[in-house]
């Protein structure tokens, strides 16, 4: 049974989200949801690491484009991870899908950290041969996206 069958977005790490939004809009006519800036805690190798990310998604879909940028040294640092970065998929069972992808050879890179230091919300994995990351997003986060897509803030 295929695990990642509900594609949501294609993630691109850029140096400047607003500048990239403008360039892509001028070239393609795509439009964007409001720019978001989040402080978040990631779980990396069992350690909680605080960072930030700035991002936006296209209005048009069905598979949207995400542009993201973050501080130097982060997973959204253009100098380290710039360009096509990941494919994002909704998941009904984040932990089971992580385990299944790991059983297939994928490496868990990081994910959202819960208050108790566990993994929650989303996770990034990388297959051993492609270099293109897989982001699993828990469907429990869908209301946050729906609120943002309806014109509110993310969350």
For every predicted segment, state its role:
Residues 37-38, 70-72, 92:
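Histidine- and/or cysteine-centered catalytic micro-motif in compact active-site loops
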Residues 107-139:
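A contiguous, mid-protein "functional segment" used to position or interact
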Residues 57-87:
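Helix-adjacent hinge/juxtasegments
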Residues 15-17, 61-63, 71, 128-130:
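Short loop segments at secondary-structure junctions
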Residues 8-14, 80-95, 99, 130-133:
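Short coil/turn motifs at helix boundaries and re-entrant loops, enriched in small/polar
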Residues 9, 23, 139:
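Extracellular/lumenal glycan-associated surfaces
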Residues 2-4, 12-61, 96-120, 151-154:
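Core segments of cupin and vicinal oxygen chelate
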Residues 133, 137-155:
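Acidic/histidine-enriched, glycine/proline-rich intrinsically disordered or flexible terminal extensions
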